[in-house]
From Swiss-Prot:
It comes from Talaromyces stipitatus (strain ATCC 10500 / CBS 375.48 / QM 6759 / NRRL 1006). One of its GO terms (biological process) is ribosomal small subunit assembly. Residues 263-290 are annotated as: Disordered. This is Small ribosomal subunit protein uS2. Its main location: cytoplasm.
Amino acid sequence: MAPSNLPPVFNATSQDIEMLLAAQCHLGSKNLQVHMEPYLWKTRPDGINVINIGKTWEKIVLAARIIAAIDNPADVAVISARPYGQRAVLKFASHTGATAIAGRFTPGNFTNYITRSFKEPRLIIVTDPRTDAQAIKEASYVNIPVIALCDTDSPTEFVDVAIPTNNKGRHAIGLVWWLLAREVLRLRGTLATRETEWDVVVDLYFYRDPEAEETKEIADESKVPGAEEVGPAAIETGYVGDSWDAAAPGAAAPGSAFAAASATAGATWEAEAGGDWAAESAQPNPETKW
């Protein structure tokens, strides 16, 4: 995918290209900003602008080389006000040592030194130039370079390196941050080559809805296996749940041992009583006054 005048190390693997296409990183919006035209491949009949995925990979490599050139990893600030990118920037920060700002960007973070959250990064990376406009604006005041994930309709003012990609889908955002982190680690020497398997899966960078996860856990807990799932043989032997092994030979149903013990105890009590209870009771004294 790299031009012929660049070394082969810039070439993307077929797996990387397939992942970018599967995550729909090439699908832009219906609007096109004039500065994003060089990254456009074509416009579909339905009006969707398709991004050149080769340009996306070139900009990921360029951005990674800029990040790796900074001596102190903590001087890189990764920012995402969009919920779909907050998990990705936190994971990127934990793997590369950058400083993450997930959620609302406090005005004055880069310009007001009196605030407790004041920072002086050497580079910032934003997920969306539109939602992270405050961070880009303050970075322009203090001459901080900006790398941004830009869609076809994203404003590119004060953006130094634009990575053309779909910045609205959760999978596209997570994959680009994952590829960027992997490329930074490769340049730092943590990973030997791109073909080296990274033990961090891309799913960790994807956004996960907390409410959906709670609903899924509740549904899994309340689910009880039915006869179709367990089988008729287990039902006949007394299977009522998943707390005992129905496949074990001679397995007894839960509660059968307690019922047998209760029956034995009842027989013992009758043997000990052995007589008429009414005959053993003392006759009341007729002269007693109550």
